[in-house]
From Swiss-Prot:
Pfam families: AdoMet_dc. One of its GO terms (cellular component) is cytosol. Belongs to the prokaryotic AdoMetDC family. Type 1 subfamily. The gene is speH. One of its GO terms (molecular function) is adenosylmethionine decarboxylase activity. The active site is at 63 (schiff-base intermediate with substrate), 68 (proton acceptor), 83 (proton donor). Is synthesized initially as an inactive proenzyme. Formation of the active enzyme involves a self-maturation process in which the active site pyruvoyl group is generated from an internal serine residue via an autocatalytic post-translational modification. Two non-identical subunits are generated from the proenzyme in this reaction, and the pyruvate is formed at the N-terminus of the alpha chain, which is derived from the carboxyl end of the proenzyme. The record marks 62-63 as: Cleavage (non-hydrolytic). This is S-adenosylmethionine decarboxylase proenzyme. InterPro entries: AdoMetDC_C, AdoMetDC_fam_prok, AdoMetDC_N, S-AdoMet_deCO2ase_core, S-AdoMet_deCOase_pro-enz.
């Protein structure tokens, strides 16, 4: 692999607003998404905003997953960044969109830490 990692930036639309505003459901979805990628979960931090919305991060050995929700718009901004080639960030992004009952998603993959020669990092 010539890149240290893959970072998926997803725009998730038409989601179930009740799910987007439920901090416990969002946390569970994000942790399960990390597991779906094959990652090792290290820590989680989630916050419920007033009057609505949730933001959170799942720190994984391979990097992180984040989400920021706007229930009033049925929208979530999702990032899944994984390092190494034993995990697949697309598995996590697709799982999240499915669990949010999204009608539409656009996503972009960014290669992170791109080097001219293949790189090998300890623990990956």
């Amino acid at each position: 692999m010539n890149a240290l990692g893959r970072h998926i930036l997803a725009e998730v639309y038409g989601c179930d607003s009740r799910i987007l505003d439920d901090v416990e459901m969002i946390e569970d979805i994000m942790v399960q998404a990390a597991i779906a990628t094959g990652a090792e979960v290290r820590e989680v931090a989630f916050h419920k905003f007033n009057p609505q919305g949730v933001s959170g991060v799942v720190v994984i050995s391979e990097s992180h997953l984040t989400i920021h929700t706007w229930p009033e718009l049925g929208y979530a901004a999702v990032d899944v960044f994984t390092c190494g080639d034993h995990v697949n960030p697309w598995d996590g992004v697709n799982y999240i969109a499915r669990m949010l009952k999204a009608e539409n998603m656009t996503a972009t993959e960014v290669k992170r830490g791109v080097f001219e020669k293949p790189v090998k990092v300890a623990n990956f």
